[in-house]
Swiss-Prot record:
Family that this chain belongs to: Belongs to the ABC1 family. UbiB subfamily.
Gene name of this polypeptide: ubiB
Organism: Escherichia fergusonii (strain ATCC 35469 / DSM 13698 / CCUG 18766 / IAM 14443 / JCM 21226 / LMG 7866 / NBRC 102419 / NCTC 12128 / CDC 0568-73)
Pfam name, any one: ABC1
Record's protein name: Probable protein kinase UbiB
Function text: Is probably a protein kinase regulator of UbiI activity which is involved in aerobic coenzyme Q (ubiquinone) biosynthesis.
CDD domains noted in UniProt: UbiB (cd13972)
Protein's pathway: Cofactor biosynthesis; ubiquinone biosynthesis [regulation]
Biological-process GO terms, alphabetical: regulation of ubiquinone biosynthetic process; ubiquinone biosynthetic process
Length: 546
C-alpha cells in the first residue's frame, strides 16, 4: 500500500471506531484477533453511544465522503443485506458536500475548451456554484453564440485517486464477508461492489451522461409528461457537460406545487406512467430519479409536466426481462404464486433445478400477508423487494438491471404518494402492463415481427438458391459422415466381440493347463501346450482391443 492509502485506511478505521461500528463485527472465532485488536485501540472510543446503530452507520458514511455515501445509498436498496432499521437509515443518506473553489472549476472548464478563457465561450459565468454534490459541481452562464442560459457541470478535481483508493478497500472488505457471515457467500458481496464500481465510474464520465440525456430527450420529445433539458454536445467532454438551464418547482416542495395550482392527482399518475413508459416502451430508464433530480414545470399546472435532470445512471431491460417482469407483476396481483415461481425459473433468474413447489410456497409465505392491505396501499417497490429477497434464498443471481429498477420504482412510488396519498399505483399501472403484454403476443405481434424482418429477407432473397444448394450439399456430406461413423462403430463392435471371445478362450486354456500340470503330471507336455495356446489366444484378443 502507498503512504496515501495507509493514511486513508487509518482515517476510515478511526471514523468507523469513533461511531462504534465495531459492533457490526460478528462474535466468531475467526474474528477474535480483530476484536482483540480493537481493544488495543483504546484511544478511539465510541463518541456517539447515545445514537442507534443504523444512524451511526449513516453518519460515518457521510463523514467518509462521496464513495461511501453512494455505496450506502446503493446498499439501502439491497434489504436482504441489512435489517430494516439499518436499511432505512442508509436510504436517508444525502449526496450533499461542501462546494470546491469556483476558480478551480473555471480552470477545468478552460482546460476542457482548449485553454481559451471562459469568456471566449460563455457570458455571465457565475463563479459561485448553483449546486454541489460528491462527484460534480454546477455553475451557471450564458452561451456566447446564442445568449441561452445554461448550466455547466464540472467533475470535482482530484477525485479519481480517492475513489480508486476507497474502492480498493471496499473490495477487501467484500472478500472478508463470506468468511465472517454464515450466509455471506450467497450475498455475493464482491459482485455487489463490482456493480457499484461500474455505476460510479459511469458517473465520472460526463460524455456518457450527455448521451443518456440526449437519448431520454429524444424518447420524450413532444411528450406532455416529461421534459429533459437540451444538451449542447459541442461543449461537452469527459469532465464537463453543458446543458439548458431549467426553472421548475422541486417535486418535494408540495406546498409550492399546491400554491401554483398543480393537479396533484394527475401529476402523481404521470410519474407512474413515465416510469413504465421508459421501462416497457423504450427499454431505457432514468435510474436515479430521487426527488433532488425531479422538478415540475411552472407552466400549465392543470396539465403538469415533470422535468428530469442528472442522467448519469440509466438502466435497460432486454425483451425477455420486460416480459417476465410484466407477467410477474400481473401474476402476483392475481395471487398466482405458482406462475410467479415458474416465471423466475423460466427467465433464468434462479437455477433451472430449483424446486418450483418449494419456491412457490416460500413466495406465498412472504407475499400473502401483503394482501391484507387494501390494493391501493400495496407498494410495487416492496412487492419487488419481497420477490427478489425470497428468490435470493433460492440462489437467484444478482441482476444489476433489476436492482436499478427496484430502486427507481421505490423513488417513483414514494414521490407519487407524497404528492397524492390516495394514489392507486396498481390501478394506474395495470392497464399499461396488460396492454403491453397483449401487444407482445398474438397476430399483431406476429405481423409487426414480419414487418421488422421483411428488409432482411428481401436482402437475402437473391442468395436463397445458393443457400439451399449449400444446405443440401452439407446435408449429403453430413449423411456420408454419419454412415462412415456408423460403419466404424459396427466394425469396433465386431472386433470387441471377437476380442472378448479370444480372451475367454485364452483364460480357459491357461487355467485348464495349470490344473492338469498340478493334478496330472503323467500327461507330460499336454498341459504346457494348453497353457501356451491359451497365452497366444489371450494375446491375440488383447491386440484386438487396441
Amino acid at each position: 500500500m502507498t503512504p496515501g492509502e495507509v493514511r486513508r485506511l487509518y482515517f476510515i478505521i478511526r471514523t468507523f471506531l469513533s461511531y462504534g461500528l465495531d459492533e457490526l463485527i460478528p462474535k466468531m472465532r475467526i474474528t477474535l484477533p480483530l476484536r482483540l485488536w480493537r481493544y488495543s485501540l483504546f484511544w478511539m472510543p465510541n463518541r456517539h453511544k447515545d445514537k442507534p446503530l443504523g444512524e451511526r452507520l449513516r453518519l460515518a458514511l457521510q463523514e467518509l465522503g462521496p464513495v461511501w455515501i453512494k455505496f450506502g445509498q446503493m446498499l439501502s436498496t439491497r434489504r436482504d443485506l441489512f435489517p430494516p432499521h439499518i436499511a432505512d437509515q442508509l436510504a436517508l443518506l444525502q449526496d450533499k458536500v461542501a462546494p470546491f473553489d469556483g476558480r478551480l472549476a473555471k480552470q477545468q472548464i478552460e482546460a476542457a475548451m482548449g485553454g481559451l478563457p471562459v469568456e471566449a465561450w460563455f457570458d455571465d459565468f457565475d463563479i459561485k456554484p448553483l449546486a454541489s454534490a460528491s462527484i460534480a459541481q454546477v455553475h451557471t452562464a450564458r452561451l456566447k453564440s446564442n445568449g441561452k442560459e445554461v448550466v455547466i457541470k464540472v467533475i470535482r478535481p482530484d477525485i479519481l485517486p480517492v475513489i480508486k483508493a476507497d474502492l480498493k478497500l471496499i473490495y477487501r472488505l467484500a472478500r472478508w464477508v463470506p468468511r465472517l457471515l454464515p450466509d455471506g457467500r450467497r450475498l455475493r458481496p464482491t459482485e455487489v461492489v463490482r456493480e457499484y464500481e461500474k455505476t460510479l465510474i459511469d458517473e465520472l464520465n460526463l460524455l456518457r451522461e450527455s448521451a443518456n440525456a440526449i437519448q431520454l430527450r429524444r424518447n420524450f420529445e413532444d411528450s406532455p409528461m416529461l421534459y429533459i433539458p437540451e444538451v449542447y454536445p459541442d461543449y461537452c467532454s469527459e469532465g464537463m457537460m453543458v446543458m439548458e438551464r431549467i426553472y421548475g418547482i422541486p417535486v418535494s416542495d408540495v406546498a409550492a406545487l399546491e400554491k401554483n395550482g398543480t393537479n396533484m392527482k394527475l401529476l402523481a399518475e404521470r410519474g407512474v406512467q413515465v416510469f413504465f413508459t421508459q421501462v416497457f416502451r423504450d427499454s431505457f430508464f432514468h435510474a436515479d430519479m430521487h426527488p433532488g433530480n425531479i422538478f415540475v414545470s411552472y407552466e400549465h399546472p392543470e396539465n403538469p409536466k415533470y422535468i428530469g435532470i442528472d442522467c448519469g445512471i440509466v438502466g435497460s431491460l432486454n425483451k425477455e426481462d420486460k416480459r417476465y417482469l410484466a407477467e410477474n407483476f400481473i401474476a402476483f396481483f392475481n395471487r398466482d404464486y405458482r406462475k410467479v415461481a415458474e416465471l423466475h425459473v423460466d427467465s433464468g433468474w434462479v437455477p433451472p433445478d430449483t424446486n418450483v413447489e418449494e419456491f412457490e410456497f416460500a413466495i406465498r409465505t412472504v407475499c400473502e400477508p401483503i394482501f391484507e392491505k387494501p390494493l391501493a396501499e400495496i407498494s410495487f417497490g416492496h412487492v419487488l423487494l419481497n420477490l427478489f429477497n425470497t428468490a435470493r434464498r433460492f440462489n437467484m443471481e444478482v441482476q444489476p438491471q433489476l436492482v436499478l429498477l427496484q430502486k427507481t420504482l421505490l423513488y417513483i412510488e414514494g414521490v407519487g404518494r407524497q404528492l397524492y396519498p390516495q394514489l392507486d399505483l396498481w390501478k394506474t399501472a395495470k392497464p399499461f402492463l396488460e396492454s403491453w403484454i397483449k401487444d407482445q403476443v398474438g397476430i399483431p405481434a406476429l405481423v409487426r415481427a414480419l414487418k421488422e424482418k421483411a428488409p432482411f429477407w428481401v436482402e437475402k432473397m437473391p442468395e436463397l438458391p445458393e443457400l439451399v444448394y449449400d444446405s443440401l450439399r452439407q446435408g449429403k456430406y453430413l449423411q456420408h459422415s454419419v454412415d462412415k461413423i456408423a460403419r466404424e462403430l459396427q466394425s469396433n463392435h465386431v472386433r470387441q466381440g471377437q476380442s472378448r471371445y479370444l480372451l475367454g478362450i485364452g483364460a480357459t486354456l491357461v487355467l485348464s493347463g495349470t490344473f492338469l500340470l498340478v493334478s496330472r503330471p503323467e500327461w507330460g507336455l499336454m498341459p504346457g501346450w494348453l497353457m501356451a495356446a491359451g497365452l497366444v489366444a489371450w494375446f491375440v484378443g488383447w491386440r484386438k482391443t487396441r
